[in-house]
């Protein structure tokens, strides 16, 4: 019998002070300006069914194929190039290698375990939200360091937030693909990574700059990406 993972609670200022987003910090203010979409994203049907091990295989396959196509969009290379300090470049480069060693490997094992052929992979059409999300990420490719660091911070932070639901509930998924996806987005390594990104947002970004709109848009598109995982009537 599946253990049910409860919904996350309503967002509040200082929720992520333990990651460096103290109440009133730039990162916390961005978070608090987008609580509705954030709450809906991390408690979405897709996330809840994945955490409860009730997600239909067809939905998981379609979602992960589209997510994998995002993987090689060059975001990390641009971040490393624009990073203002060598230590930041080194941190980002190390995480980029971690993605290659762990996330890419997860995708490859998933495609093999679920017998996803190259033909099926290529034929999987992006959802409307996926198309919009991809176009938006492409539009950020020539933007400033504050906008780009906000982009990746928001994406990774939101994923940690939904994965944290199952840790808080002390529930371990029994479907390997579900557990593997959670494990990629929770744990000491991923928490440190998100904390490092939050620290950079606090240092280089402003709630009055264009990066605040980047945060808002990413949260909105992440919610729609989850919702669009299901056939739309």
What would you call each of these model-derived segments?
Residues 2-47, 187-196:
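Acidic, low-complexity proline/glycine-rich segments
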Residues 10, 18, 28, 65, ...:
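Active-site-proximal alpha-helical scaffolds that flank and shape metal-associated catalytic sites
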Residues 35-40, 54-82, 149-160, 226:
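Alpha-helical bundle segments that constitute or directly flank the non-heme di-iron/ferroxidase center
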Residues 41-42, 72-77, 105, 194-201:
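Extended amphipathic alpha-helical scaffold segments
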Residues 45-58, 72-93, 141:
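Helix-loop segments that flank and shape redox-cofactor active sites
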Residues 47-52, 137-138, 201-206:
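Short, charged/polar, low-complexity loop and linker segments
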Residues 188-216:
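Long amphipathic all-alpha helical oligomerization modules
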Residues 215-233:
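A cross-kingdom marker for long, charged
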């Amino acid at each position: 019998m599946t253990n049910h993972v409860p919904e996350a609670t309503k967002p509040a200022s200082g929720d992520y002070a333990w990651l460096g987003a103290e109440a009133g910090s730039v990162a916390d203010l961005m978070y608090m300006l987008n609580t509705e979409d954030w709450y809906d994203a991390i408690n979405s049907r897709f996330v809840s069914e994945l955490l409860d091990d009730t997600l239909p295989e067809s939905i998981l396959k379609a979602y992960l194929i589209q997510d994998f196509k995002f993987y090689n969009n060059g975001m990390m290379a641009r971040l490393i190039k624009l990073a203002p300090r060598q230590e930041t470049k080194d941190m980002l480069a190390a995480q980029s290698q971690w993605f290659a060693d762990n996330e890419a490997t997860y995708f490859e094992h998933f495609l093999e375990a679920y017998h996803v052929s190259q033909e099926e992979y290529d034929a999987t059409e992006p959802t409307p939200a996926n198309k919009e999300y991809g176009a938006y990420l492409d539009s950020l490719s020539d933007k400033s360091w504050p906008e780009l660091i906000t982009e990746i911070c928001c994406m990774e932070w939101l994923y940690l937030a939904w994965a944290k639901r199952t840790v808080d509930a002390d529930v371990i998924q029994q479907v390997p693909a579900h557990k593997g996806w959670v494990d990629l987005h929770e744990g000491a390594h991923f928490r440190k990574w998100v904390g490092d990104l939050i620290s950079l947002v606090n240092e280089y970004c402003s709630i009055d700059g264009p990066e605040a709109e980047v945060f808002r848009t990413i949260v909105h598109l992440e919610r729609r990406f989850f919702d669009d995982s299901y056939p739309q009537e």
